[in-house]
């Protein structure tokens, strides 16, 4: 167990909580906007999803991720269906990730929840019939983003952002 896991993280002030979550939501939204061409549909590599590993280090980031996802999904061709269902997936995944401290396991909730729930929503609301194929495509996209980008982001944040956010030295 490393120093980060041994020490109790101090509570954030309301101002810092709101500012950090605003930044997280804005970065998520910006990444989806810039990479729209690969952020929607069954075959997607939503770069912003790499941030869904952050609750493992910063449980408070659940709010920013949820808001960022909601705002991003309003750009989807699926409209409010995606805004609501995608946001619920992100919220549940972030809450689960916040209790998992090992990065390779912390990346699993967003991968698994999005992989199984989003194709189900497409099946129920849009008549998509290839449920298991869509599960596979979403799984591949999520896994690539979370493990290729999310894990390095986790280690970068652990080294460089944890001391700033929690005002501590490791």
Placement of each model-derived feature along the sequence:
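Interfacial helix-start motif at the membrane-water boundary
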Residues: 56-69, 78-82
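Membrane-embedded alpha-helical hairpins and interfacial helices in multi-pass inner-membrane proteins
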Residues: 37-42, 50, 71, 77-170
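Intrinsically disordered, low-complexity non-transmembrane regions of multi-pass membrane transporters
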Residues: 1-13, 159-170
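Short hydrophobic/aromatic-rich motifs at helix boundaries and adjacent loops
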Residues: 19-25, 64-68, 90, 122-125
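Hydrophobic transmembrane alpha-helices
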Residues: 2-63
């Amino acid at each position: 167990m490393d120093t980060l896991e041994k020490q109790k993280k101090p509570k954030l002030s309301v101002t810092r909580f709101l500012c950090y979550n605003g930044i997280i939501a804005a970065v998520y939204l910006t990444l989806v906007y810039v990479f729209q061409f690969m952020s929607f549909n069954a075959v997607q590599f939503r770069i912003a999803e790499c941030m869904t590993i952050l609750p493992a280090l910063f449980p408070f980031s659940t709010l920013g991720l949820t808001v960022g996802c909601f705002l991003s999904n309003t750009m989807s061709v699926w409209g409010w269906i995606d805004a609501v269902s995608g946001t619920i997936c992100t919220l549940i995944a972030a809450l689960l990730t916040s209790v998992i401290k090992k990065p390779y396991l912390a990346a699993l909730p967003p991968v698994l929840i999005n992989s199984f729930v989003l194709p189900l929503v497409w099946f129920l609301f849009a008549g998509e019939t290839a449920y298991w194929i869509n599960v596979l495509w979403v799984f591949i996209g999520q896994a690539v983003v979370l493990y290729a980008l999310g894990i390095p982001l986790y280690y970068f944040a652990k080294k460089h952002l944890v001391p700033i956010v929690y005002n501590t030295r490791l």
